[in-house]
């Protein structure tokens, strides 16, 4: 196990479990962890979640915050009975609340599994395919740029210098005839 450390937005330090003997990359892993005792260290995979504020980064503020008043409105002069309005409000609110709970109970865990797999694949591809491809491309481009630079300095520079010298001696005299 590694001793990788991560800090979240609240300043908590997370780490994967630390072995007593360390590992081949960080043999003094346990000693390093004890030095950081002033910060509370959490396991990255068992991070405590907030059951009250479930959208701490406000991802869905503009999208799914739909209340009864956002969907159904009666303008002045066109009002239903007060009892109907109250019953409609209650029906809408309770139906939305419980149907969301039903859908999340049925599909929440399977969707979390699917999205977990998707983002794991995405992370894997980024780490093991995209970044190495970009790095190799940059290495190849650097090699090609050196060859291109030699070509330009060998062939193009002398040619354009010669053309520049040819045209540098051209003089234009304008005279007005009377």
Curated annotation (Swiss-Prot):
Intramembrane annotation, residue ranges: 105-125
Its membrane topology: Peripheral membrane protein
Sites bearing Phosphotyrosine, chain numbering: 6, 14, 25
Lipidation (S-palmitoyl cysteine): 133, 143, 156
GO CC terms in record: acrosomal membrane; caveola; caveolar macromolecular signaling complex; cell cortex; cilium; cytoplasmic vesicle; endoplasmic reticulum; endosome
Biological-process GO terms, alphabetical: angiogenesis; angiotensin-activated signaling pathway; apoptotic signaling pathway; basement membrane organization; calcium ion transport; canonical Wnt signaling pathway; caveola assembly; caveolin-mediated endocytosis
Entry keyword set: Acetylation, Cell membrane, Golgi apparatus, Isopeptide bond, Lipoprotein, Membrane, Palmitate, Phosphoprotein, Ubl conjugation
Function: May act as a scaffolding protein within caveolar membranes. Forms a stable heterooligomeric complex with CAV2 that targets to lipid rafts and drives caveolae formation. Mediates the recruitment of CAVIN proteins (CAVIN1/2/3/4) to the caveolae. Interacts directly with G-protein alpha subunits and can functionally regulate their activity. Involved in the costimulatory signal essential for T-cell receptor (TCR)-mediated T-cell activation. Its binding to DPP4 induces T-cell proliferation and NF-kappa-B activation in a T-cell receptor/CD3-dependent manner.
Assembly: Homooligomer. Interacts with BMX, BTK, GLIPR2, NOSTRIN, SNAP25 and STX1A. Interacts with PACSIN2; this interaction induces membrane tubulation. Interacts (via the N-terminus) with DPP4; the interaction is direct. Interacts with SLC7A9. Interacts with CTNNB1, CDH1 and JUP. Interacts with TGFBR1. Interacts with CAVIN3 (via leucine-zipper domain) in a cholesterol-sensitive manner. Interacts with CAVIN1. Interacts with EHD2 in a cholesterol-dependent manner. Forms a ternary complex with UBXN6 and VCP; mediates CAV1 targeting to lysosomes for degradation.
Name assigned to this protein: Caveolin-1
């Amino acid at each position: 196990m590694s001793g990788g450390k991560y800090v979240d937005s609240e300043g908590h330090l997370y780490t994967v479990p630390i072995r007593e003997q360390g590992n081949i990359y960080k043999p003094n892993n346990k000693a390093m962890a004890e030095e950081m005792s002033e910060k509370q260290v959490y396991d990255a995979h068992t991070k405590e979640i907030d059951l009250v504020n479930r959208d701490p980064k406000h991802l869905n503020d503009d999208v799914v915050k739909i209340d009864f008043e956002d969907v159904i409105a009666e303008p002045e002069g066109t009002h239903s009975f007060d009892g109907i309005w109250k019953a409609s409000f209650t029906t809408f609110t309770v139906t939305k609340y419980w149907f969301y709970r039903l859908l999340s109970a049925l599909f929440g865990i399977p969707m979390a599994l699917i999205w977990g797999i998707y983002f794991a694949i995405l992370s894997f591809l980024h780490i093991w395919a995209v970044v190495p491809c970009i790095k190799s491309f940059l290495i190849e481009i650097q090699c090609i740029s050196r060859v291109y630079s030699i070509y330009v300095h060998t062939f193009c520079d002398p040619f354009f210098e010669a053309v520049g010298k040819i045209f540098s001696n051209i003089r234009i005299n304008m005279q007005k005839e009377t």
